[in-house]
Amino acid sequence: MTENAQPMFSIEKIYIKDLSLEVPNAPKIFLERDTPQISVQLRTEGNTVDEGLYEVTLTVTVSATLGEDRSVFLVEVAQAGVFQIRNVPPAELEPVMMIGCPNILFPYAREAVSAAVSRAGFQPIVLAPVNFEALYQQQQAAKEGGDVAIQ
């Protein structure tokens, strides 16, 4: 392999693409003493920006509810990055974008969620680390109709 054909990966820019926070039952919700049920959803999307430049967006949605229908808060962060990815075989490009890039973006999204929730008057939410490789394998297995155990 020549020097020009070496795989190349670099971070060009990391930014918040979208951030929303809803506290629909304020101020009465602050009087509640029950511990809310927390739900976390993740979604990763990748798009081509230019030749060798890709935008990856990791969307983290965290909702807190009391009982089945009383919303405490809903926060959604779309943490994005522009990555330069060159000389990577086509079969390896998707795993880089769906595993490697989200691993880089997740700490930024986690901090944005925690900051938004605490600024809304609640205890900060600390999201647990995510195994993006296992999520990717699960999604691939679902596409192919197979089963993969998540560890």
Swiss-Prot record:
GO cellular component, one term: cytoplasm
Keywords noted in UniProt: Chaperone, Cytoplasm, Protein transport, Translocation, Transport
UniProt xrefs under SUPFAM superfamilies: SecB-like
Coiled coil location: none
Top-level taxonomic group: Bacteria
UniProt key word Transport: yes
Subcellular location: Cytoplasm
Molecular functions (GO terms): unfolded protein binding
Disulfide bonds: none
Subunit structure: Homotetramer, a dimer of dimers. One homotetramer interacts with 1 SecA dimer.
Function of the protein: One of the proteins required for the normal export of preproteins out of the cell cytoplasm. It is a molecular chaperone that binds to a subset of precursor proteins, maintaining them in a translocation-competent state. It also specifically binds to its receptor SecA.
Entry similarity comment: Belongs to the SecB family.
Protein name: Protein-export protein SecB
Organism: Azoarcus sp. (strain BH72)
Classification lineage: Bacteria, Pseudomonadati, Pseudomonadota, Betaproteobacteria, Rhodocyclales
Gene behind the chain: secB
